[in-house]
Swiss-Prot record:
It holds the Pfam family GTP_EFTU_D2. Signal peptide: none annotated. Keywords: Cytoplasm, Elongation factor, GTP-binding, Nucleotide-binding, Protein biosynthesis. Its main location: cytoplasm. One of its GO terms (cellular component) is cytoplasm. One of its GO terms (molecular function) is GTPase activity. It comes from Paracidovorax citrulli (strain AAC00-1) (Acidovorax citrulli). Belongs to the TRAFAC class translation factor GTPase superfamily. Classic translation factor GTPase family. EF-G/EF-2 subfamily. This is Elongation factor G. The keyword Acyltransferase does not apply.
Length: 700
């Protein structure tokens, strides 16, 4: 089967934004204009095609990034047909992991901002992730029809808060109620959309007289930005004072793909204006799979290697999302980087060391699916029949093994005990939680050995609420949840040169004998536990050293203060002794545990608590109340910014333990007019009175 669309005409893009900037509505309009949807789905009435989990329709927020394919020939049909694979990403801060995951497999992104709210806290998080994966992006300022809409203020905020370099390629005609259309700075014409045809038809008109001067200035800035792409363009611009439409597009495209600039557009998705021009900009400025560097990975011998976006290369793909589907079971969403995959092929998973067979391949259109025979480089699709693949793993040709870089997922910061309402559901709950954990790497499940309770942990209260909710809807298991518990950690502040551990049992017959001397010292934050073997002259025989390390790894699961996991400690084994007959692995493992525990007691142990970056957006009248309340929660207020539509954005760092129930408190303090977002920042030492309270609570 030959390729239907040349790979140069592929665009794998994400649409990403803060909650309520109108991202799902924007995606809906894209599906409408590209001819896939006949009736536009509105989020307001819970009918949007991309929000396909029931919960999303109820809460009006997008949780999972559904992947959809559509085609576009330009708003005036002047382009050859391009194929868009669109990944819709959630904007809520508890789902940052979803955004991170989709960024990894995208070639470009459209950042949607609200013309009234501007650059909101979540927009900054998403921007940082796009920087991390070097994703070229455009900006689309939505909701230009709303009271308080201001395109140029959002432009200033992008520069200030995101350190971005936006280059408007259109400017708005009017704003709020009077928003009519845009001035296309390349053609220097006004684009006015026809409301009766839901924006399918439009006219090019002369630029309104009151905008002529402003349009000229902004065009000048755009041409300058394009000219900086190459010496050739710069020379022509300096000689002639202008560039042709094609040259401007080329210059802007080059710099956008190099992530030096971000073309900026505007419109109102809800009123069907501006999205069509944004689709043209996706073709003009965002990269196809062949415009970006080949994907990097490692081969069987851990040597670095790359895979080009080419059908003739060996097959390689990344599984970036799992979903459980009520009809076909598990769907594994993959992004193909190289080669071709056909139905029935076998693929190899180097992380698990397993070979698996692909059953069916489906391409999603929101949650309708089309079966396809094969997928090629640049495609995004879902495979049915893979049993043992988790998010972030590579699939490749068994004859040409490659591991594409693994994604790194954050550690959960909040935990809750969960139990089924009826005892008979225990097993069903176990299966449901395992499934959900395979889908979402930032969600973990474990059994508490002492109490036998099932503990679930995740990135925030909303995250766990949604998990419990999905258990009920998708698996029919109703559960009771305990009070949220903070995931504290322990570490040390001093170095202990000699921490001795001995395990001796000698009472006739074969005994036990293990003896180690450890140096225990603080490690850099985030480095974890490091074990160093510095034994000289065989005082501890080689074969027992892994047992010592095993002992350390076991000992760090429970700290000496309150039994929380120990982090960021470096342990060096530098001396010890053994007995020819009585020494064995168990004895050395036990000696290491005793030595580590003793050493920690002397090494200035402390409790660490998770600190959260909190940002509250509030009307100015309540700013003082909000800041006072954050301080009373042991928060450090770090700054206050003005927001585009009035009001203040307050940034603070607050311990997670003080943030439970914050949404209710904030609502009542500000009469429901303030909103907040919160994400994990880092662990920091808990003050003494807090540590004592934590220890007392654990001792009960």
């Amino acid at each position: 089967m030959a390729r239907k669309t040349p790979i140069e005409r592929y665009r794998n893009i994400g649409i990403s934004a803060h909650i309520d900037a109108g991202k799902t509505t924007t995606t809906e309009r894209i599906l409408f204009y590209t001819g896939v949807n006949h009736k536009i789905g509105e989020v307001h009435d819970g009918a949007a095609t991309m929000d396909w989990m029931e919960q999303e329709q109820e809460r009006g927020i997008t949780i999972t990034s559904a992947a959809t394919t559509c085609f576009w020939k330009g708003m005036d049909m002047s382009y050859p047909e391009h194929r868009f694979n669109i990944i819709d990403t959630p904007g809520h801060v508890d789902f940052t992991i979803e955004v991170e995951r989709s960024m990894r497999v995208l070639d470009g992104a459209c950042m949607v901002y609200c013309a009234v709210g501007g650059v909101q806290p979540q927009s900054e998080t998403v921007w940082r992730q796009a920087n991390k994966y070097k994703v070229p992006r455009l900006a689309f300022v939505n909701k230009m029809d709303r009271t308080g809409a201001n395109f140029f203020k959002v432009y200033d905020q992008m520069r200030l808060r995101l350190k971005a370099n936006p280059v408007p390629v259109v400017i708005p005609i009017g704003a709020e109620e009077g928003f009519k259309g845009v001035v296309d700075l390349l053609k220097m014409k006004a684009i006015i959309w026809d409301e009766a045809s839901q924006g399918m038809k439009f006219n090019y008109e002369e630029i309104p007289a009151d905008l002529a001067e402003s349009a000229k200035e902004w065009r000048e800035k755009m041409v300058e930005a394009a000219a900086e792409a190459s010496e050739e363009l710069m020379n022509k611009y300096l000689e002639e004072g202008d560039l042709s439409e094609e040259e401007i597009k080329l210059g802007l495209r080059t710099r956008t793909i190099a992530t030096e600039i971000q073309p900026m557009l505007c419109g109102t998705a809800f009123k069907n204006k501006g999205v069509q021009r944004m689709l043209d900009a996706v073709i003009d400025y965002l990269p196809s799979p062949v415009d970006i560097p080949p994907v990097a990975g490692t081969d069987e011998d851990e040597a670095e290697t790359t895979r080009k976006a080419d059908d003739n290369e060996k097959f390689s793909a990344l599984a970036f999302k799992l979903m459980t589907d009520p009809f076909v079971g598990q769907l594994t969403f993959v992004r193909v980087y190289s080669g071709v995959l056909s139905k029935g092929d076998s693929v190899y998973n180097p992380v698990k060391g397993k070979k698996e067979r692909i059953g069916r391949i489906v391409q999603m259109h929101a949650n309708e699916r089309l079966e396809v025979e094969e997928i090629r480089a640049g495609d995004i699709a879902a495979c049915v029949g893979l049993k043992d693949v988790t998010t972030g793993e590579t699939l490749c040709d068994p004859e040409a093994i490659v591991t594409l870089e693994r994604m790194v997922f954050p550690e959960p910061v909040i935990a809750q005990a969960v139990e089924p309402k009826t005892k008979t559901d225990q097993e069903k709950m176990g299966i449901a939680l395992q499934r959900l954990a395979a889908e979402d790497p930032s969600f973990r499940v474990k059994t508490d050995e002492e109490s036998g309770q099932t503990i679930i942990s995740g990135m925030g209260e909303l995250h766990l609420e949604i998990i419990v909710d999905r258990m009920k809807r998708e698996f029919g298991v109703e559960a009771n949840v305990g009070k949220p518990q903070v995931a504290y950690r322990e570490t040390i502040r001093k170095t202990v040169e000699e921490a001795e551990g001995k395990f001796v049992r000698q009472s006739g017959g074969k005994g036990q004998y293990g003896h180690v001397v450890l140096k225990i010292e603080p490690n850099e934050a985030g480095k974890g536990i490091e074990f160093v073997d510095a034994i000289k002259g065989g005082v501890v025989p080689r074969e027992f050293i892994p047992a010592v390390e095993k002992g350390i790894n076991e000992a760090v699961t429970q700290g000496v203060l309150a039994g929380y996991p120990v982090v960021d400690v470096k342990v060096t084994l530098h001396f010890g002794s053994y007995h020819d007959v009585d020494s064995n692995e168990l004895a050395f493992k036990m000696a290491a545990i005793f030595g580590f525990k003793e050493g920690c007691k002397k090494a200035g142990p402390v409790i660490l608590e998770p600190m959260m970056a909190v940002e509250v957006e509030t009307p100015e009248d309540y700013a003082g109340t909000v800041m006072g309340d954050l301080s009373s929660r042991r928060g450090m207020v770090q700054g206050m910014d003005d927001m585009v539509g009035g009001g203040k954005a307050i940034k603070a760092e607050v311990p997670l333990s003080e943030m439970f129930g914050y949404s209710t408190a904030l609502r009542s303090a500000t009469q429901g007019r303030a909103t907040y977002t919160m994400e994990f920042k880092h662990y920091s030492e808990a003050p003494r009175n807090v540590s004592e309270a934590i220890m007392a609570a654990r001792a009960k």
